[in-house]
């Protein structure tokens, strides 16, 4: 099962993976904002307040995790772009050296 999941994950482009992670991060931030708004505006019992704070802690951890994932993905995207530029430069060099 993990093999098929890995194969599917490899077929996804880095740019689409970045978009997906950014969307999830945005959803978590929106949920966090709603939770903070509820905490400020509503009179909550101690149990509800603790549950809300736990939820906010979990959401903050998820946002941090997504930010780390984005940082890694952007680095990978940057590396892929540099590799593409290098291949283009080498191709142009060979073209002008041997064909032109």
Curated annotation (Swiss-Prot):
Q: Per the annotation, which location comes first and is thus the protein's main one?
A: membrane
Q: Which residues cross the membrane?
A: 82-99
Q: What is the protein name given in its UniProt record?
A: Coiled-coil domain-containing protein 167
What is the topology of this protein in the membrane according to its UniProt annotation?
Answer: Single-pass membrane protein
Nucleus: is it a keyword of this entry? no
Localization per Swiss-Prot or TrEMBL: Membrane
Residue ranges of coiled coil: 14-81
Q: Which InterPro entries match?
A: CCDC-167
Gene symbol here is ccdc167
This protein's species is Danio rerio
Q: Which GO terms describe its cellular component?
A: membrane
What are the record keywords, sorted? Coiled coil, Membrane, Transmembrane, Transmembrane helix
């Amino acid at each position: 099962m993990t093999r098929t999941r890995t194969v599917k994950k490899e077929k996804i482009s880095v740019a689409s993976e970045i978009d997906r992670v950014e969307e999830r991060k945005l959803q978590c931030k929106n949920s966090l904002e709603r939770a903070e708004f509820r905490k400020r505006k509503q009179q909550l019992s101690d149990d509800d307040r603790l549950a809300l704070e736990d939820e906010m802690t979990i959401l903050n951890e998820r946002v941090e995790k997504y930010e780390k994932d984005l940082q890694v993905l952007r680095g990978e995207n940057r590396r892929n772009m540099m590799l593409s530029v290098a291949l283009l430069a080498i191709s142009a060099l060979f073209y002008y050296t041997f064909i032109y």
